[in-house]
């Protein structure tokens, strides 16, 4: 884990004024969201971000584009996408495959797929089970605390965090939450999870 971490640190590029792939996320508000997360990570050393975007505004495309930027700038090698239902996991994996076809992908809910992929898609429950159960060739844990550099949480809200907080505390990774819940309707604990001032994602 440390070797991988120091390798990533050495290869990192600044995130100020990043080039965003318009083919993935061309809408101005998607670009603003990506740059805001990049600024928070790169300039303010934040490790958590929350994207509040209305249904149909392209949350998945925005996070794919964010992942693309972070990968190209050396901040992310492996990422984990978590959702609460299999259908959302499948949907997200398909979207990543369409936009980033060279990125190796794995749906953990499908046992036939290679869990050594750079982008892993899973339900929360499946990942909880896999942390202890999945082993590498040497017999150690496949998913060590430093395995992922970025965790994306689909529909981030307090009930998910309360139920599966062990996932978020186990992995030492950047955490990006996605939600369509309007800022003024969001539980204040959701802001606390992402270490944000209430009402200011």
Where do the PLM segments sit?
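ATP-dependent helicase/translocase motor core
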Residues: 1-78, 83, 87-102, 116-119, ...
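Conserved ATPase-coupling elements of RecA-like P-loop NTPase cores
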Residues: 92, 130-134, 155-166
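Conserved H-loop
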Residues: 84, 155, 180
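Conserved motor-coupling elements within RecA-like helicase/translocase cores
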Residues: 108-120
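Post-DEXD/H (motif II) to motif III coupling segment of the RecA-like Helicase ATP-binding lobe
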Residues: 158-201
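Walker B catalytic acidic pair
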Residues: 123, 154-155
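Acidic/polar loop patches that form or flank catalytic/metal-binding clefts of enzymes
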Residues: 103-108, 176
């Amino acid at each position: 884990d440390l070797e991988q971490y120091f390798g990533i640190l050495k290869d990192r590029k600044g995130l100020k004024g990043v080039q965003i792939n318009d083919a993935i996320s061309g809408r101005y508000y998607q670009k603003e969201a990506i740059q805001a997360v990049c600024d928070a990570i790169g300039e303010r050393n934040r490790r958590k971000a929350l994207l509040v975007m209305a249904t149909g505004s392209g949350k998945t495309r925005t996070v794919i584009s964010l992942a693309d930027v972070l990968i190209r700038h050396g901040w992310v090698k492996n990422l984990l996408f978590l959702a609460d239902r299999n259908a959302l996991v499948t949907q997200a994996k398909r979207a990543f495959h369409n936009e980033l076809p060279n990125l190796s992908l794995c749906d953990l809910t499908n046992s036939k797929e290679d869990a050594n992929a750079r982008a892993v898609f899973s339900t929360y429950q499946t990942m909880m089970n896999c942390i202890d159960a999945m082993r590498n060739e040497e017999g150690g844990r496949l998913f060590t605390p430093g395995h992922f550099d970025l965790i994306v949480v689909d529909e981030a809200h307090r009930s998910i965090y309360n139920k599966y907080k062990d996932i978020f505390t186990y992995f030492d990774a950047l955490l990006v939450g996605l939600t369509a819940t309007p800022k003024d309707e969001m539980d204040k604990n959701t802001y606390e999870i992402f270490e944000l001032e209430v009402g200011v994602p």
